[in-house]
Design a protein with these regions (language model features):
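Acidic, proline/glycine-enriched N-terminal capping motif
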Residues: 1-119, 258, 262-269
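Generic detection of long, well-ordered alpha-helical segments
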Residues: 1-4, 126, 130, 137, ...
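Generic structural signal for hydrophobic residues
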Residues: 10, 14, 136, 164-165
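Basic, nucleic-acid-binding surfaces and adjacent catalytic neighborhoods in DNA/RNA-processing proteins
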Residues: 22-40, 49, 54-56, 60, ...
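Active-site donor-binding loop signature of nucleotide-sugar glycosyltransferases
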Residues: 69, 124, 241
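A short, charged helix-loop
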Residues: 103-145
Length: 269
């Protein structure tokens, strides 16, 4: 958390407040975590985009501000007890909050991502035309890692984190420990379709909010996709697939808590 749907929701809400505005001050007390931010002061925001889980502010004079929200990062329109960065604009002040302090900021020359290596090797956006079944199949065929680990790596497809990997694997009936290269063409197509469906629905629902200190939209509203979860955070509850008698179990895959139905997501190869 936050993953692509939460970051995209944040981008859409912030865009009208940021676009065309000049950053007057960018205040914080952690230069090791929020790097080179003094370079953004006095710069106009020409655009706000997203790549995977990263927000990217295009600034004038060839700079970009890259923001990774970490596990608990987000923006607010009012001061918050966990405010870490204050972004002062001519007619608005935005407050970046992060209770667990895992988020990071960088201000870099546009396209210079040497400090942010993942941006340079990230896979296609799941809701873009670049994310194709053929390309996805080629990426999975090249690795013996477990499919859940591959999805989390961001290299086969961008922006899929723990929640939406579990949801996509549930929807496609694929066990999270299946070696990626063993997926059949039909399974790859199902997973490709599931990722697009889950991500699209989650974006429209404003993402998922799991607790009071987890992701919220900048206006203070929660996301609502958690009410549609089929696997994530449903340990011990009945599987929601029609006709399935299983219950959701939790295990660890790639160091991450992983939720799935052992009845309809069997580890057959």
């Amino acid at each position: 958390m936050p993953e692509l749907p939460e970051v995209e929701t944040t981008r859409r809400i912030l865009e009208p407040y940021l676009l065309g505005q000049r950053i007057q001050k960018l205040l914080h007390q952690d230069p090791a975590r929020y790097r080179h931010t003094e370079r953004a002061e006095g710069r106009k925001v020409l655009g706000i985009s997203r790549r995977g889980k990263y927000l990217i502010l295009q600034l004038d004079q060839g700079l970009e501000a890259i923001i990774h929200l970490g596990m608990t990062g987000g923006f607010r329109f009012e001061p918050h007890r966990h405010t870490r960065v204050t972004l002062v604009l001519p007619q608005q002040t935005l407050y970046y909050t992060d209770p667990r302090r895992f988020g990071k900021w960088w201000v870099v020359e546009a396209g210079d991502y040497r400090e942010i290596g993942l941006l340079g090797r990230m896979g296609p956006e799941p809701l873009s035309p670049d994310f194709t079944p053929v390309g996805f199949k080629q990426a999975l065929a090249q690795t013996r890692r477990k499919i859940k680990e591959v999805l989390l790596s961001q290299e086969a497809v961008a922006g899929v984190g723990n929640i939406y990997a579990d949801e996509s694997l549930w929807l496609s009936k694929i066990h999270p420990e299946r070696p990626a290269h063993t997926l059949s063409p039909a399974e790859v197509k199902r997973l490709h379709r599931a990722i697009r469906e889950v991500m699209g629905q989650a974006v429209e629902a404003g993402g998922s909010t799991l607790s009071d200190e987890s992701y919220q939209q900048p206006n203070g509203e929660p996301g609502y996709f958690q009410f549609a979860h089929k696997a994530y955070d449903r340990t011990g509850q009945p599987c929601r697939r029609r006709g399935c008698k299983g219950r959701i179990v939790k295990m660890v895959v790639g160091g991450r808590g992983t939720h799935f139905c052992p009845v309809c997501q069997q580890n057959s190869r």
